[in-house]
Amino acid sequence: MYAVVRTGGKQYKVSEGDFLKVEKLEGAVGDTVNLSEVLMVGGDKVAIGTPLVPSASVVGKIVEQGKDKKILVFKSKRRKDSRKLNGHRQLRTILKIEKINA
């Protein structure tokens, strides 16, 4: 069985036992997270939401909280010798999908 969930403005296809790297979610390591924005549930029967599947949810456990790799943002103005270099590390959460309720 699999599901398509929406979190952090992105959509992810998940199955039970998968590890999922998402935008930062509130909670400590070991806490349980309920993802209620389920767009589709597949398996023996396929249920497609309009836009969400009613009474469907995905339960996950927070495995790790941390930051992604650094990305560099470089801005310059042509012919002005004006340059700006910034670094950014996005906060992220790693979940282990435990159960899909459909």
Swiss-Prot record:
One of the GO BP terms on file: translation
Alphabetized UniProt keyword annotations: Ribonucleoprotein, Ribosomal protein, RNA-binding, rRNA-binding
GO cellular component: cytoplasm; ribonucleoprotein complex; ribosome
Gene Ontology molecular function: any one: rRNA binding
Quaternary structure annotation from Swiss-Prot or TrEMBL: Part of the 50S ribosomal subunit. Contacts protein L20.
Function statement: This protein binds to 23S rRNA in the presence of protein L20.
Family per similarity comment: Belongs to the bacterial ribosomal protein bL21 family.
Protein name: Large ribosomal subunit protein bL21
Protein's organism: Geotalea daltonii (strain DSM 22248 / JCM 15807 / FRC-32) (Geobacter daltonii)
